[in-house]
Amino acid sequence: MQRLVLVLILVLLPLACGAQQRVELWTYHFSPPFLLENAQGLSHAFVELLNNDPGNHNRFRFELVELPRKRVDVRLARKHPGVLLWATPSFFTAAQVANGKWSQPLLIDQQDFVSLPDAPFEYEGPESLHGLVLGGVLGHRYAELEADIASKAITRQDVQTDLQNIQKLLSGRINTLLIPRSTLLYYRKELQLGELYVSATPLYQFARHLLINGAIGEAVTRYLDGFLDALPNNPEWQILLYQYGLEPIASEQ
């Protein structure tokens, strides 16, 4: 009898130890470098980094969930347990993040004005864009410029993607474009773009954090805290930053 009990323990123990907590990682950033074709991009790679981390000990199975921003807002409001990737505190209301906990910044990003080197544009406030054609992305709101765009002092032409804007700039159809520095760095590395002029003054700067939302559990919260504290010195994270051209904007905190 004792021998049978021992055998059962040896059989069942690995199954019990192998039970994993599923943790959703949400993203509403669908542009490079965060999402690429064929399940590639920084978001997928970050999930793999968590799942393969030795400190995880197979306790947690992180899964990427791609959501439009409105559905993210619903999950936050309902206190749904999960982790929001690459989020910026100023882009959310206090009520939306009342049940969440912010990590330290992972990336220090900004909205850059990019132009051709033979016709460089330097941003000095909305008035400096008067009479120019600005390339924007559909659905993006540039608060500081909205009044001048509405009055048609600034001509804004929208496209679906940042890459389309770059192509329009290179063909001379717009004077300047707005693009996140993270996306610009990726395309510079991936497409080996020639010299482009980047305004010394961006439209604005913003930090990208993780937002741990809802009752996700003390164990996973404690694990993520330790993982993120060590992230700046994690060689696998450094490889990802190099791969996507993001070393210049990586936070050292």
Q: Where would I find each of the regions flagged by the language model?
A:
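Extracytoplasmic small-molecule ligand-binding "clamshell" domains
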Residues: 20-97, 136, 158
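Short helices/loops that flank or line small-molecule/ion binding pockets
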Residues: 66, 70-83, 128, 162-183, ...
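Ligand-binding clefts/hinges and TM-proximal coupling segments of bilobed small-molecule sensing domains
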Residues: 58-61, 140-151, 195, 228-253
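Bilobed "Venus flytrap"/periplasmic-binding protein-like clamshell domains
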Residues: 30-33, 37-49, 116-151, 182
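Periplasmic-binding protein-like
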Residues: 28-31, 108-112, 189-225, 248-253
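Acidic, polar ligand-binding/catalytic clefts
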Residues: 64-128, 142, 200-203
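A ligand-binding cleft/hinge motif common to bilobed small-molecule-binding domains
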Residues: 85-97, 175-204
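Extended ligand-binding regions for polar small-molecule ligands
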Residues: 44-54, 117-120, 132-133, 210-248
